Amino acid sequence: MKTILVILDGLSQHVAQHAMGYLHAECAHGKGHYYSLNCALPSLSRPLYECILTGVAPVESGIIHNDVNRMSHERSVFHYARDAGLTTAAAAYHWISELYNRTPFEPARDRHTDAPTLPVQFGHFYSDDGYPDSHLFEDAESLRLRYNPDFLLIHPMNIDHAGHQHGLSSAAYRNRARMADGYLSQWMPGWLAEGYQVMVTADHGMNDDRSHGGMLPEETTVPLFVFGEGFSRKAGLAPQQTELCGTLCSLLGVTHDKSVHRALLAGSAS
């Protein structure tokens, strides 16, 4: 099954539970389900990109801080999909390129990636935290239409950026979440109509000190929305962030050796 993973960087469950009106509407109409999960520690971006995409916790991967700038030593969803002959793409922050394609990031070489031998074969990568989410979703849709990827990562940054500027309990942070929900309302109906499985989550949350990295619930509790016939949409599940990689690989139908939250998947997904 073709699958889209949306990582809304820095979106705390504290805000996702009330600000994402479109996503909750789709859930209310039986097209998806909303869960929450606790992110791995430390609640920092680069370690948790690695956790989500490889299923390996930061203390095991060695990516334990944002300043650990090296390629991943683990196999990611991108690797499994590419090796199975599937097509991969990402519209994402440049740390994704550094983890799985090449490091250090060289904008002239890497910002627009068209390299079928790399794990992320096709990509639009940005390095400015203020890069507009509206443009990022357009970048993603351009990749989808041009390359027809089996696995597409969409990774906007403006929620996290607003949190670092204004904090969790700010209108700016909440409104950035609402804006991301609006962009999803523009694009996601088309994805679902074309049979995509869609997972929307966050790497970590945000606190009122305009930071994250620790163990406060607002930093560690993040949303998980799932949409599509590949998901069971069962209530009461407690998926782990380390299980998302294997669950995505199972949706894609590729051979892998990662942990899976089986109850998230419908009977047709293995």
What kind of feature is each model-predicted range?
Residues M1-S270:
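Feature captures the catalytic ectodomains and active-site-proximal regions of enzymes
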